[in-house]
Amino acid sequence: MGAERLKVIIVGGSIAGLTLAHCLDKAGIDYVVLEKRKEITHQEGASILILPHGGRILDQLGMFHSLSQYTEPLHAAHISYPDGFTHTNRSPQVLTDRFGIPLILVERRNLLKVLYNSLPDQSLVQLGKKVVSLNHHNGQVTVTVDDGNVYEGDLVVGADGVHSRVRDEVWRLSDAIRSGTVKDKEKKSMSIEYACIFGISNGVSGLVAGEQVASLNKGRSFLTFPGRDGRVFWFLMHKLDKNYTYPGAPRWSPEDAERIAARYIDDHIWNGVQFKDIWDKREVCGITNLEENIFQTWHSGRVLCLGDSMHKMAPNTGQGANCAMEDAALLANYLRHYLDGQKTAAKPSQEDLNTLFEKFSRDRINRLQSIYKMSRIVVRLHAGRNLFLRLMGRYYLPNTGDVPANQASKSIASGIYLDYLPLPTYSAPGWQDFAPNSKLFSGSLLLIMSVALLFGVICWAGRDIHPLSMKILALLGNYVSQ
């Protein structure tokens, strides 16, 4: 690769940013990470679900097993409904058996701790560096931070989250080249319909480690993940009074979280456990808006954004962090391919980076569309947003067998991995059986939902006098998912 190595400036010590640092290190590409906070592992009470495609990337980087000390693998999924009906499925265990990697829930700070502590050179992560501006200069890009220091590199990657400063700079740089390049419609395309209170509690009896619970209700839902040592990770998704446009959503305080929680304090979670039992034993909690969007403009010049800065979805499907890690892996793949294909040590021109960035963003948008749509459906289904989704949640989901696992398997098997590192060997068939070119990959989400609506109405109209309809619904649901 020559004496002068490519240098990447990563803005944001996030999951995406630190994963990218590892990927670049393995690819032999220089980097520096600029993080505005004074510490990497700030305690927020947030937790992250690692699905097999995200776990595979972490495994390639040698970190997945380091997370096991913090986690209890998921093996069962319960659903409870406001009418008292409950349902249990084995989707987490099915996915583990199919892909050879357990589904694990880990505190966000512990994942960041593992990512940070396992870096070969932690001095390359610069803390307390808030970005002020980005500028192009003589085939390089410079980043100025609030303490006056200036960093120079060949490209900048914004991994600085949903409130991204780098995204603002991408828009500014694009408009400086040609006014109106980024339309106001795109700048206002991120919406907020739900807020989330999240936290960690301890000593809650009645919940079993490794058995997740989705508690559905009208206008809100709970996701509960009992973990190791009596700890419980939980989320309360709450529908707002209207659909807001970013950044115009309400700002929340701890008092707001207490006020909202009090409204649902008697809601049933599972096995006699009420939300009160979890809330009263909270160790830490927070509240945040659930932004939703996939932006279309990911780059300008030598600057590219990824992770939550470009795609943000509700936590109900657990895909957010996994998709961010995929972003990091794919970008590292493309940069490595570029360098391997060069006959000289010349660094990438602006035209080279435009081509690479455009391919990267198109490939990621294409991959993310179905994942994003599913996350939008699931958060609204869990909160019973309309009659169709309430029918689907109550009468279709409990009778679908492995349909949810099959849908998840398709997105998992299509996941990105680091193509310049060895793939872990798993004696599990799911990676091949649910690959995009396999027979099991075919099937239409729209068709599934249409069948769900038709037979949900039949079941709802007759309530308990149509058990045959429910069986037919389950059979058709399994059929159309294949």
Curated annotation (Swiss-Prot):
GO CC list: membrane
InterPro entries, alphabetized: FAD-bd, FAD/NAD-bd_sf, FAD_mOase_fung
Function: FAD-dependent monooxygenase; part of the cluster that mediates the biosynthesis of shearones, diterpenoid pyrones (DPs) which are structurally diverse meroterpenoids consisting of a diterpene linked by a pyrone, and which may exhibit a range of bioactivities. Within the pathway, esdpE takes part to the biosynthesis of the molecular scaffold by catalyzing the formation of an (S)-epoxide ring at the terminal olefin of the geranylgeranyl group.
Binding site for FAD: 35, 108, 308, 321
Cofactor needs: FAD
E.C. number(s) listed in UniProt: 1.-.-.-
Protein name stated in the entry: FAD-dependent monooxygenase esdpE
Signal peptide: 1-21
